[in-house]
From Swiss-Prot:
GO molecular function, one term: 2 iron, 2 sulfur cluster binding
Lumenal-facing ranges: 1-35
Obligatory cofactor(s): [2Fe-2S] cluster
Gene3D superfamilies found in the cross-reference section: CDGSH iron-sulfur domain, mitoNEET-type
Biological processes per GO annotation: autophagy of mitochondrion; regulation of autophagy
Organism: Branchiostoma floridae
Keywords, sorted A to Z: 2Fe-2S, Endoplasmic reticulum, Iron, Iron-sulfur, Membrane, Metal-binding, Transmembrane, Transmembrane helix
Protein's recorded name: CDGSH iron-sulfur domain-containing protein 2 homolog A
Length: 131
């Protein structure tokens, strides 16, 4: 614990006192190359720390894109489609990407979704067994 205390009470204040921050904007012209390097390293570290701590709150759009169903029956708490097995023909394709205009049937919208997102979703294909 003494090690941590020494870092917080001695080393960090010493480092912050050594950062060459001029008193005025004109003082930046008087900095040497070594002082500029020290200032850039300090500024970069502070910028990276601020960016990493704020980044989770910046990209709300990414959180919106994580939703699977973006527009189909949003007024319902759960989307359920019942299909009578007797109504199936020889082959039917059901959408699994939630982008189909003919939902619950697939219209191939997953191809654009896969291209845009790098996903690999495809339809659920139900086919009668050949006898």
């Amino acid at each position: 614990m003494e090690f941590l205390s020494k870092i917080v009470r001695v080393h960090i204040p010493d480092y912050l006192n050594s950062v060459p921050v001029p008193d005025s904007f004109g003082g930046f012209l008087d900095l040497t190359a070594g002082q500029w390097l020290h200032l850039f390293a300090f500024s970069g570290t502070v910028a990276a720390a601020v960016y990493m701590s704020v980044k989770p709150y910046l990209d709300k759009k990414d959180q919106k894109d994580q939703l699977v169903n973006l527009r189909i029956q949003k007024e319902s708490s759960k989307v359920v489609n019942m299909v009578d097995i007797e109504d199936l023909g020889n082959k039917v394709c059901y959408c699994r990407c939630w982008r189909s205009k003919k939902f619950p049937l697939c219209d191939g919208s997953h191809a654009k979704h896969n291209e845009d997102t790098g996903d690999n979703v495809g339809p659920l294909v139900l086919k009668r067994k050949d006898v």
